[in-house]
Amino acid sequence: MSREHNNSFREISMKIGVPKEIKPQEKRVALTPTGVAELVGRGHNVLIEKDAGVGSGITDSDYIAVGAVISDTAERVWEESEMIIKVKEPIREEYPRMREGQILFTYLHLAADEPQTQALLERKVIGIAYETVQGDDGSLPLLTPMSEVAGRLSVQAGCHCLEAVNGGRGLLLAGVPGVRPARVTIIGGGVSGINAAHLAAGMGARVTILDVSADRMRYLEDIFHARVDTLMSSAANIRQCLSESELVIGAVL
């Protein structure tokens, strides 16, 4: 890159802040040191709240080494940053820290959170939701990885719930020799549903996927090679699957 281009980046540099996630059980951090290095290399200033990366195994020293500045408080991060990058949506405690014109880049999931929507409107924040960012081909590159994780984790959680010690029926998803495996129904054949099916079928469960698209079901048949069954999603088929299944996973966006 030419010196002229480097200068142009610095002229439009931004102050980017990464506060520590405070939603219960959330251990992730929005930027890794690699991401910080990329932003700093383009002339941006990155402010990271102290210990923001600890839950992900990243130390303050790791961030400092690539050019970030560490803030002792979340208030400073929110106050000094033109753009805030988070993992999860802001919670009520964070609403007062948002200010007019500030860019908030994170998962927002506004459809299920009217109070947050109202707070963003009242604070006049520029909210960019990860889950709505689209590629040129209509794909959702920031939502897809989370859907992959959710799909696989749903099977893991289902196995846990099926254990007798957790109030379940005492079933092993894969079964054992002489005992049939559990029947798993997955409603929705998108990214999350496919990943759930991969794990459940790989463990030996009998898997059925329901979807409303015939083209999607043909695609599922192609990738699973008869390892799962597919059904058109209808009220009757859903009722039948619910009555026969030990584990049902909802995977509809």
List each language-model region with its residue ranges:
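Residue-level detector of structured alpha->beta connecting loops
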Residues: S81-E82, K124, H225, E246
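Short beta->alpha connector loops at strand-helix junctions that form conserved
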Residues: E49-K50, T73-A74, Y107-H109, A129-Q134, ...
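Glycine-rich phosphate/diphosphate-binding loop of Rossmann-like nucleotide-binding domains
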Residues: P19-I58, G167-L253
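An N-terminal-biased, well-structured beta-alpha scaffold segment characteristic
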Residues: I12-S13, V18-A119, R123
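Short, hinge-like loop/turn segments at secondary-structure boundaries
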Residues: Y63-G67, T144-E148, H225-D229
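Glycine/serine-rich phosphate-binding loop and adjoining beta1-alpha1 elements at the start
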Residues: K15, E21, P90-R183
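Short gly/ser/thr-rich secondary-structure transition/capping motifs
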Residues: A65-S71, K86-K88, A164-G170, V228-S234
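Short, Lys/Arg-enriched N-terminal segments with co-localized hydrophobic residues
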Residues: R3-S13
